[in-house]
Amino acid sequence: MKALVKAKREEGIWMQHDVPVPEVGVHDVMIRVTKSAICGTDVHIYNWDEWSQKTVPVPMVVGHEYVGRVEKVGAEVEAFRPGERVSGEGHVTCGFCRNCRAGRRHLCRHTVGVGVNRPGSFAEYVVIPADNVYRIPDDIPDDIAAIFDPFGNATHTALSFDLVGEDVLVTGAGPIGVMAAAIARHVGARHVVVTDVNDYRLDLARRMGASRAVNVAKEDLRAVMSELGMREGFDVGLEMSGNGRAFRQLLEVMNHGGKVALLGIMAGPEPIDWSQVVFKGLQLKGVYGREMYETWYKMVAMLQSGLDLTAVVTHRFSIDDFQQGFDVMRSGRSGKVVLDWGAAR
């Protein structure tokens, strides 16, 4: 089959046409991929950075954001049938550790990542356990279904705390950050402010519904807060940037008793002023992946109740033009990039 493969321990990803079709175990589902999306993780793997070198075995079929149709099911699978439109949870869990057995599978210490530690979805076919397959309702378009993985990250982070009537700061205007901003507005936040230094992505945040999108290299965040009539500080902070300076600024402008969810991953150890956390009585929560499968139910429900993510998909290419997709993702001038397998030559 055709697939995008991390075939060498160097920068790049390569199209190969002779990749073996993955085998279907008795509890597995084979999915014929129709659309894939490029994740920031895929860019890290493309760049072959330090994390990728330590994490990804080579060769590896990459990719974990996709939508497709069931092609084949294992002998013990009864919940799905060929032809159904589905996506899949990208974290494959052990099912036996304490967290898995308690229903907290997103905290499994033995998690294996699709497209990172096992063959992924930048391929004509991907095989995952039936427990990881999620059926997509007919009223959700393919482009949005293909980005359920990062949409799930945004949902899990944004809904970590009650947002109704709250003032929310989102640090980082990447695709997950701007989706989190849209979610916050959808569920009833008062002011949603997004910060970054990338004007392209700040404009995307505005189109996704942010009250204000602030380039902190050019604007004073506290002045923006005053302009919005905020007298104390932000009630909820969503750290999506993985940037230490942005996180420190977030702590400075949080209200006493505020709550902070962190999804962004710092490149290394970062100093912070712990007195901001202690004396303000802040709550900090680390977020990983998606709650299985409460996050997925909430994603569908929000889309069906009017949440509009259309603007976050900014570029579309045939899978044969995947290099253009990676180039635009690496430029920083894009939202989500979707690759169409149906348009392949």
Swiss-Prot record:
InterPro entries: ADH-like_C, ADH-like_N, ADH_Zn_CS, GroES-like_sf, L-Threonine_3-DHase, NAD(P)-bd_dom_sf, PKS_ER, Zn_alcohol_dh. Its cofactor is Zn(2+). It catalyses: L-threonine + NAD(+) = (2S)-2-amino-3-oxobutanoate + NADH + H(+). One of its GO terms (molecular function) is L-threonine 3-dehydrogenase activity. NAD(+) binds at I176, D196, R201, L263, G264, I265, V287, Y288. Signal peptide: none annotated. Zn(2+) 2 binds at C94, C97, C100, C108. GO terms for cellular component: cytoplasm. It comes from the Bacteria. The keyword Oxidoreductase applies. The active site is at T41, H44. Its EC number is 1.1.1.103. The keyword Nucleotide-binding does not apply. Zn(2+) 1 binds at C39, H64, E65. Pathway: Amino-acid degradation; L-threonine degradation via oxydo-reductase pathway; glycine from L-threonine: step 1/2. NCBIfam families: PRK05396.1 (NF003808), tdh (TIGR00692). Belongs to the zinc-containing alcohol dehydrogenase family. PANTHER family: L-THREONINE 3-DEHYDROGENASE. This is L-threonine 3-dehydrogenase.
